[in-house]
Amino acid sequence: MKLFGGPRYPEDIAKRIPPGQRLVKGWPVLQYGPIPRFNEAEWDFRVFGLVENEYTLSYAELKALGPVKVPADMHCVTGWTTLDNEWEGVPFRMLAERAGPKPEAAWVITHCEYGYTSNLSLQAMMDDDVLVAWANQGEQLAPEHGFPLRLVVPKRYAWKSAKWLRGLEFTDRNERGFWEVRGYHTHADPWRDERYSYEESRDSEAEP
């Protein structure tokens, strides 16, 4: 099958590639700012906001929660796709259930190093394949790919899978993050080709 004038892929591969995407080899590196240094003695991970039980975990405590492995493809808003990634980490759902989101909590803000943030609806984040991950393809994440921790949201463009994750905030407001205020889509569904904010409907407070 030929997609948008691009390369031809076998049918079983083509159906896994969203509109406007192309398959690439390797794992491209894209980021804003320098790679942060990791000091495990000073590092922590916070879950807070509109929850019944705010908590903070060390890196060792987080990794001891009962990791799982999830196979998932990755789609970058710049147009590349990689297939058959295997991620290892803790399900977001597990972290959320431990915190106990309050009824009014409808959005999650991901907080990362250097003040970077991103936003997604709680509904989207509660998918079974959403992970807080520390490994890919059986190996610890490389620093340029998010070590020590990154979010993985397979059903959204990859900027929502924020690198160098430090916290999750539950909120009742759709607060746009770093790239969202710079013109990128709130929901970022690659299968809907949701790349830019001008494509959003007037009511972007709910997941489509």
Predicted regions and their residues:
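Structured, non-membrane catalytic/scaffold regions adjacent to prosthetic-group chemistry
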Residues: 1-208
